[in-house]
From Swiss-Prot:
Belongs to the WD repeat CIA1 family. CDD domains: WD40 (cd00200). HAMAP family: ciao1 (MF_03037). WD repeats lie at residues 12-51, 58-97, 106-145, 151-190, 195-234, 245-284, 303-352. This is Probable cytosolic iron-sulfur protein assembly protein CIAO1 homolog. One of its GO terms (cellular component) is cytosolic [4Fe-4S] assembly targeting complex.
Amino acid sequence: MLNVREVQKLKASNKRLWSLSWNHKGSVLISSGEDRVIKLWAKCNDQLWGSSFSLPEAHKKSIRCVTWSPCGTYIASASFDGTVTIWKISEAHSAPEMEALVSLEGHTSEVKCVAWCPSGHLIATCGRDKSVWLWEFDDEEDVQCVSVLQPHSQDVKSVAWHPHGEVLVSTSYDNKINVYREELDDWTVFAQLSGHDSTVWKAEFSPSGDILASCSDDLCVKLWSWEGVCGKSSSWMCIATLSGYHTRTIFDLNWSPDSQLLASCGSDNRLCIYKMPANGLTHIGGKPCFEEPPVLWGHVPNAHSEDVNCVRWKPGNITDISHSESISNCHLFLTTASDDGYIKFWSIEYEL
């Protein structure tokens, strides 16, 4: 079993925290929430993290999602005010500065999520208006809408990209997961995944790109894969269901950088960590499957005092994570954010 240990706790807000995102180097964390503030967090010394920059009133209403661009130069923030703002980060005068480049307008209600594609040239947004928007972000920092989709019958909760190609997924209150690709210069749904019995809050591809994980109001985490090539003619199927570990809605999940561990969190205040089989995904009769089932490898029953809304693994390898005394034996490192206004930093220790 893992040893999951809290190593730091930061009071980030007096209101709900909803979103966290690490830059690609794992050197800066951003947070956002109900207070409309975007905060950047960096190492104060070898052991502790602290606030390095704070931008109050970044939006007119709550900021539901913040995320770094793949290059680490830009941040996108999605708000209940119906807009998404693209910010440019600079290190002028030895301190971070944020410049608002453009506001993406078009959604007619709350924007719930924003996600950059791996190349950084496409941005996906989704919201309460049941729509998914695709935006092109070019080298001159110009943004234009390239597609508007309304494939769901209810609010769209999240969007996420495949790590190796321009394939997009969205999740919704309609209990469905839609998978999109570009065909003839337009984006279309080429697969719809049914299996959850209630709202699907989040779906995310593993960094290896061969598994899609989803979590739901039905208290289940499901793992999906496909025959053929993702984005081409492929038949999708659920290859595992992880249930019985959360007692209330599962809000978020996130893969570890090596695709071996999956973390989930929810309104039961819990943090759960699952281990994938050591021999990974295999194929029997041409169909993807596990020879052994994924297992719950560790959990924290009361990770926070209130709902845990977000969990994010820190990018990086063992060397750049394990140099400080406080986490000297840590192989991996993750963060959580909660309705209680705290960000928590956790070390994950286990035998290789």
